[in-house]
Amino acid sequence: MAIRAKKAGFDGIEVCANHHVPLSQFLSPMFNHRTDEYGGSNENRARFVIEIIKKIREKLGNEYIILLKLNSEDDDPNGITPEGFITACKLAEQAGVDMIEVTGMKWKKNRENKLVYFDMGKILADTLKIPILVTGGVKNLYVANDALNNSNIQYIGICRAFLSEPDILVKWKNCEDKKSQCVSCMNCYKIDNSIEINCILNKRKKKKNLKKNN
């Protein structure tokens, strides 16, 4: 798939080892109970992900951009530890990753205007030499700027705020309302895969407008 992405003209790819997909499960002791070279220690649990990164780097060359997205926590006491997360990130940097995206499983519960993984992202940015991107709960321009100005974190990831307001960056650039209308209700997450992903707040607005016009 990575080779196809390069042939198609993409500048880089992201290896997803987050949100309990199979690669994420290798990293987490909550799922990984293996007793061979792919389980047991933090280094062993990271081995499969690192092997994939090395193979991608080998096939695509040193100039191709590779990102790694992984959980910094599993929202479970038996999940990945801070030490396990940092170890995996260090090994990924050594394997040739160009950037790491920090996420986890607590973003579903976040209804506050704060960057959920700021603390872990800050630690990682102080530990590694490669750029760090932190995502999870960014719905406020002040929160994003505060994170960038008060740490070595270089990038902020935004998702649900875009679903709610696709033009939110234009608003922020024009110094309009600094806060997204997104309330982290997670209805966009619950929508059936057979239909388009949308924000329930926008659907309600459309219904109100239709009623007004009628």
What are the roles of these predicted feature ranges?
Residues 1-214:
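Flavin-dependent oxidoreductase catalytic cores
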